[in-house]
Amino acid sequence: MRLIARPLTAEAFAHFGEVLEAPGTPGRAYFDRALANRHPAASPSLSIVAKEPLPALPLRSAVMERHPFSSQSFVPLDAGRWLAVVAPRAADGGPDMARARAFLARGDQGVTYGVCVWHHPFTVLDRLARFAVVMWRDGTAADDEFVEVPAFEVHLPD
């Protein structure tokens, strides 16, 4: 399967979560969906991740993940462009890869994946990137679910 990454916009991403962007003028933006938690035993978790860029396009993968009890937010601290790949839930509960979408984010855009939203592990382009990652965790295997999916590729538009 071949996906073409489209520019990340709040409208296009709304079904999967929330786009995190600073306001264009002085002020504050609130992102209340960034802290969703459905597990009373979980605690908030903040991690800082440094990630090497993808060596070459296209992105080729056969894995998706979700967090059954927590949203997960990626906030760029020092980043170039990066990819957010998402899929709605299929009737069997797994990712519906036939309806998967790929988004090309700018280095000043973050996302919150909603609770239980299938997504690909985040992939950075251009250069080493640093992100803050916020989610809820209880330290068990239930925090993360990874599944194999049919192979797919993500390309940038021509």
Which residues are covered by each model-predicted region?
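Conserved metal-binding segment of the jelly-roll/cupin
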Residues: 104-118
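Residue-level detector of short, conserved catalytic/binding motifs and their immediate flanks
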Residues: 72, 111, 129
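Non-catalytic, conserved peripheral segments adjacent to functional cores
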Residues: 1-102, 126, 135-142, 147-148, ...
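Short hydrophobic/aromatic-rich beta-strand segments that constitute the beta-sheet cores
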Residues: 83-84, 112, 120, 133
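Ligand-binding loop in jelly-roll beta-barrel domains
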Residues: 116-132
